[in-house]
């Protein structure tokens, strides 16, 4: 199939809302639909609280995966589903790839795990062990990174080299109280660069809303507040924004791409032909 329609869903957290928005996106003709990172629950990584470990589930038990498998089958859509995964005594930040027949093609576990006062993910997630992966779905070969992965050009390049035709980044990002800056433009430009450098469309879906941590004995009286800035977008193969959302409203973005035409453009530029991997030894060392 040459043409494919993708969608980014921007919303506050909640499974019921996610199901509703996926149905709406499918009704608009979307075939591959991206929801935000960890959309089932509030962004619990704002605090260190052992009680939040109970939010982790196995793939088989996860409510979002099970509900969206049915939606995928009924509407013939592909859904990368972000969730908090438990495997034995280990927990991961994971995306399950649900194909258009409702089957799970496989999973990707987040590689890069951030850690500061407002994004305390190292407390909850073990660094992923899957490596970057690409799935041959019903509509396209897709690669998926998760939030902080989107800041690393290596992530996108690995997926491109593995044959991805589209890149997807479920996200939960907002205000930066420590840095005291608005990171949104930087965030967008970073991924637009990945799209341009790999000559590959890219979809990013972020949540919205303000989420506040209430101090308690369980979280050592921590306090925190994050305002997620939405601004979800779809970039084309040149990195140009072809669809973009605002900062604070529920939105569904859709766009149709001609994968055959993009493949020819990618070949014509020669950026993969002219790579010199033998010269990139520094990439294997810490900076």
Question: Over which residues does each language-model region extend?
Answer:
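N-terminal active-site segment of His-dependent metallophosphoesterases
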Residues: 1-32, 168
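Short glycine/proline- and charge-enriched loop/turn segments
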Residues: 46-55, 117, 217-223
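Active-site-proximal beta-strand elements of phosphoester/diester hydrolases
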Residues: 3-13, 94, 107, 134, ...
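Cysteine/selenocysteine-centered motifs that mediate thiol-based redox chemistry or coordinate metal-sulfur cofactors
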Residues: 130-162, 262-287
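CN hydrolase (nitrilase-like) catalytic-core segments centered on the catalytic cysteine
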Residues: 57-80, 141, 147-252
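Short beta-strand scaffold segments in enzyme catalytic cores
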Residues: 81-83, 94-97, 133, 232-234, ...
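Cys-nucleophile CN-hydrolase/nitrilase-fold catalytic domain and related Cys-dependent amidase chemistry
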Residues: 19-107, 173-200
């Amino acid at each position: 199939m040459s043409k494919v329609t993708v969608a980014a869903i921007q919303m506050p957290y909640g499974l019921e809302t996610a199901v509703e928005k996926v149905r709406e996106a499918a009704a608009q003709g979307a075939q591959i639909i991206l929801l935000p990172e960890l959309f089932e629950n509030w962004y619990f990584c704002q605090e260190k609280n052992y009680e939040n470990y109970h939010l982790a589930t196995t793939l088989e038990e996860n409510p979002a995966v099970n509900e969206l498998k049915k939606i995928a089958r009924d509407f013939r859509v592909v859904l990368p589903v972000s969730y908090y995964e438990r495997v034995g005594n280990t927990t991961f930040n994971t995306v399950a790839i649900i194909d258009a027949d409702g089957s799970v093609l496989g999973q990707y576990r987040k590689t890069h795990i951030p850690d500061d006062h407002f994004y305390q993910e190292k407390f909850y997630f073990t660094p992923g062990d899957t490596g970057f992966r690409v799935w041959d779905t019903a509509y396209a070969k897709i690669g998926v990174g998760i939030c902080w992965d989107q800041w690393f050009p290596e992530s996108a390049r690995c997926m491109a080299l593995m044959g991805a035709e589209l890149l997807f980044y479920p996200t939960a990002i907002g205000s930066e109280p420590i840095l005291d800056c608005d990171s949104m433009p930087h965030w967008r430009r970073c991924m637009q660069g990945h799209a341009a450098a790999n000559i590959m469309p890219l979809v990013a879906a972020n949540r919205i809303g303000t989420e506040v941590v209430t101090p308690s004995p369980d979280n050592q009286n921590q306090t925190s507040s994050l305002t997620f800035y939405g601004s979800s977008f779809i970039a084309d193969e040149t990195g140009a924004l072809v669809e973009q959302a605002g900062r604070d409203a529920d939105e569904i973005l859709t766009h149709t791409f001609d994968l055959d035409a993009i493949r020819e453009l990618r070949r014509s530029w020669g950026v993969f032909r002219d790579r010199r991997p033998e010269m990139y030894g520094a990439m294997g060392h810490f900076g």
